[in-house]
């Protein structure tokens, strides 16, 4: 009698893209999962012969890869999808977004918008997302219920909102939320100062001290428009990036979101600091904010990850669309068709994202011992044939709607395109109610 090893899941697929090692692709293999961890990748013939499995899932013509990591967004703002379009950032924020948020942002808005965002992200292959928004306690509760993975960056601004009245209160509430979820397996909480133009020196200096003491990340919109740079030079005599560096806020724990206005000196400063750049190409394109020089950044060793930004400015949370835009936009900006190749674009949405959020040892690739955050993509559709190169199809075709199954920490959250922990019907009904509420005030 042959001895066999017992395992929880065997996902038997036509292709497995582990991301690490780089450019490796397995054919006709199985991903073995034990509890919440990846056990190994073996030929399917070996899985059938040597393993007793609790559940075997056959995925012919499908590809397995790590779940995508959306490194910047505002989940609640999914309720503002299409609310204000075709205008520059300052007009969009000051005349449309901030006024409606002042009236409506609250726990119900954050919960309903967050659930809508999570449903969209899960169905398009995102398993972990970073979020910066008010009422983080409401989103954290929704994330826990959904079983998704999240990095929550509590916002700090100089002005009052429905959530807090002063920078000190934002920090106090944020640290309380961080303490609440300190031991949660799927949720982490860090600092999210909104931007250099909305947070003064004193709060930023306090954040630098706290972040250093707590070894906490700092997530900030930075160098998003030419006007931001010009205003900073006029007021402070320096560019925003240098201002942060002078305060001790530019470290390997810093996320510089957008970075569309970037000089050679900025790139050198980023590279020397170890800070991460979060590239949001589709939002930047829509707002005409500028272009992030991803090829130049990566050539200098800067880690570049991807985010969708909020659906209010994108208008989609599909990370496959984002990584495609990153690849195409990166080639155009560099003037080089070989810049940001398909594998590099996928790395930005997976292992680079894991590096940025400090979870490289747990997420971002299908390696033994890592968390079983896995997605399956159906490659059987006619418009993908012939599949000469599955990785090319992942990046250069429309892929998000082809995600068939999703696991987070070994738990199946999408099964044959159906959500298992969230209710489509309830989420759609809530979104319709918000459309009526928000539309009545326009």
Curated annotation (Swiss-Prot):
Which EC number(s) does UniProt give?
3.5.4.28, 3.5.4.31
According to its UniProt record, which cofactors does this protein need? Answer: Zn(2+)
Enzyme class per UniProt: hydrolase
Pfam families given for it? Amidohydro_1
Per its record, the protein catalyses:
S-adenosyl-L-homocysteine + H2O + H(+) = S-inosyl-L-homocysteine + NH4(+); S-methyl-5'-thioadenosine + H2O + H(+) = S-methyl-5'-thioinosine + NH4(+)
- UniProt cross-references to InterPro entries, sorted A to Z: Amidohydro-rel, Deaminase_MtaD/DadD, Metal-dep_hydrolase_composite, Metal_Hydrolase, MTA/SAH_deaminase
One GO molecular-function entry = metal ion binding
User: Which residues does the record give as substrate binding sites?
Assistant: 101, 194, 224, 309
Q: Which keywords has UniProt assigned to this entry? A: Hydrolase, Metal-binding, Zinc
Cofactor: binding details: Binds 1 zinc ion per subunit.
Report TM segments: none
Q: Which residues bind Zn(2+)?
A: 72, 74, 221, 309
Which PANTHER family does this entry report, sorted A to Z?
AMIDOHYDROLASE-RELATED DOMAIN-CONTAINING PROTEIN, AMINOHYDROLASE SSNA-RELATED
What's this protein's function? Catalyzes the deamination of 5-methylthioadenosine and S-adenosyl-L-homocysteine into 5-methylthioinosine and S-inosyl-L-homocysteine, respectively. Is also able to deaminate adenosine.
Q: Which family does it belong to?
A: Belongs to the metallo-dependent hydrolases superfamily. MTA/SAH deaminase family.
NCBIfam families membership: PRK09045.1
Name this polypeptide is given: 5-methylthioadenosine/S-adenosylhomocysteine deaminase
The protein's organism comes out as Teredinibacter turnerae (strain ATCC 39867 / T7901)
């Amino acid at each position: 009698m042959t001895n066999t090893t017992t395992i929880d899941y065997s996902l038997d697929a036509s292709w497995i893209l582990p991301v690490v090692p780089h450019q490796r692709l397995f054919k006709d293999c199985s991903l073995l999962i034990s509890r919440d961890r990846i056990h190994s990748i073996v030929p399917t013939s070996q899985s059938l012969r040597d393993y007793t499995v609790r559940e075997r899932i056959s995925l012919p013509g499908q590809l397995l890869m790590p779940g995508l990591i959306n490194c910047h967004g505002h989940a609640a703002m999914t309720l503002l999808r299409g609310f204000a379009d075709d205008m520059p950032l300052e007009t969009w924020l000051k005349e449309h977004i901030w006024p409606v948020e002042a009236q409506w942002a609250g726990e119900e808005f954050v919960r309903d918008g967050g659930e809508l965002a999570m449903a969209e992200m899960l169905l398009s292959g995102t398993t972990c997302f970073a979020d910066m928004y008010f009422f983080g306690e409401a989103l954290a509760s929704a994330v826990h219920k959904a079983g998704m993975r999240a990095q929550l960056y509590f916002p700090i601004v100089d002005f009052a909102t429905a959530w807090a009245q002063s920078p000190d209160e934002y920090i106090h509430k944020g640290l309380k939320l961080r303490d609440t979820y300190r031991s949660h397996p799927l949720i982490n909480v860090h600092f999210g100062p909104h931007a250099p133009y909305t947070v003064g020196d004193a709060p930023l200096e306090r954040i630098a001290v706290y972040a250093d003491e707590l070894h906490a990340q700092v997530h900030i919109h930075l160098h998003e428009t030419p006007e931001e740079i010009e205003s900073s030079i006029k007021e402070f005599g320096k560019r925003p990036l240098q201002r942060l560096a002078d305060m001790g806020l530019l470290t390997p724990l810093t996320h510089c979101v957008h970075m569309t206005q970037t000089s050679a000196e900025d790139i050198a400063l980023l590279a020397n600091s170890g800070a991460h750049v979060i590239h949001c190409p589709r939002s930047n394109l829509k707002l005409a904010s500028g272009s992030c020089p991803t090829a130049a950044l990566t050539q200098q060793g800067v880690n570049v990850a991807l985010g969708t930004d909020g659906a209010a400015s994108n208008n989609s949370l599909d990370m496959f669309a984002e990584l495609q835009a990153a690849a195409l936009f990166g080639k155009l900006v560099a003037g080089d068709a070989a810049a940001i190749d398909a594998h590099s674009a996928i790395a930005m949405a997976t292992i680079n994202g894991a590096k940025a959020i400090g979870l490289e040892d747990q997420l971002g690739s299908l390696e033994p011992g890592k968390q079983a955050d896995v997605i399956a993509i159906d490659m059987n559709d006619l418009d993908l044939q012939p599949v000469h190169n599955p990785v090319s199809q992942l990046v250069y075709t429309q892929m998000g709607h082809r995600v068939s199954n999703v696991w987070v920490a070994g738990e199946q959250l999408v099964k044959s395109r159906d959500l298992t922990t969230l209710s489509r019907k309830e989420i759609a009904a809530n979104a319709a109610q918000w459309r009526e509420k928000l539309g009545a005030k326009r």
